[in-house]
Amino acid sequence: MRKLMRIDLIFGLLATLTVSPLNAQEGAVAKPPLKIRIDNTANRGIDFLLIRGQNDDGSFSPESGVAVTALCVQAILEHRPKATDSAAIQKALKYIESMIRPDGGIYAEGSYYRNYETSVAVGALVKANDGRYDSQLHRAELFLKEIQWDEGEGIESSDAAYGGQGYGKHKRPDLSNTAFFVEALRNLGNGEDDEAIQKALKFIVRTQNLTGHGNDTEHAGRIGDGGFYYTPAAGGQSQAETTANGGLRSYGSMTYAGLKSMIYAGLSSEDPRVVAAMDFIRNNYSLSDNPGMGQAGLYYYYHTFAKALDAAGAEILDDADGKPHDWRSELTDKLIEQQQQDGSWVNSDNDRWMEGDRQLVTAYALLSLAHCSQ
């Protein structure tokens, strides 16, 4: 009996010695909770912007006008809302204020990107507003609605350009600028039934590769994958080029921009246009590239990806193979992996659309992380 007890004891000790190191190893590689991963990563990015990214006049990458400065301010305040009164943010806000024009727009002198600059500046001023910017924001709203492509530009609702926004100063409307415009109106408190947002919806649905449901363009049925492209105006254009039959190829960043904007305009998850967009997203789920565009616009893609899925209330996405994806966690981990030693992000593989600019790309990454938070 005593011998049996000794054998049992020996096997028990061996089992303990075998299991304990494995358990210890598992504990060592376990990920911190999502919030901690986001906060730690965002703090490094914010430190980069505040320590290395800001100029003496308060701006970030001023060669792009006010846009990058506004995106950086908004990105920082998304993570640190109490930083509004910090010296760095106050300097940046003063720089943005210096770009407020008599027509209500917020843009650099002589800018050809008036809608884009004003729309993103609105996002920053809304985040920092405690009442001090009420008047400026009201005037910015009037400016944005005034330059929307509608009857004021001499076109009817049947025109493919109707309801859209371009960079400004009569530039052809496109989905990217229209998405920034709709987001600005939403930030300003406009509801889904706002007239300008509903006009924008007419343009947005015409950028989708889907027949019917308000899409009467010649390109609507040539691909039919539910994704979105750059613009249907002036004959149409996709940054992902065309198919042999003249179809305008869908790509990732515009599809997420389109989905987000449709949701802001009040379309439900059951609407055929939203369903089709989600089908494209599931069939082209990726964090390694901007589907249809490779590495071009990758961080712009990440930020539209996160904003759209957050707006859609999506938590787990099944891809084309039926594999489930916790997109918030996966995108956070991808951004952790890509963060530079100095805390910044940059698109080292493709600098198209200014993604060689660390301040801009870091702002995109921080905005993405903010929407990964639950």
Each language-model region and where it sits:
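Bacterial N-terminal signal peptides
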Residues: D8-S20
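An alpha-helical repeat/solenoid feature that recognizes helix-turn-helix modules
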Residues: Q25-R44, S59-A88, P102-L142, I147-D333, ...
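A non-catalytic alpha/beta surface segment that caps or lines the substrate-entry region
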Residues: G53-Q54, E97-I100
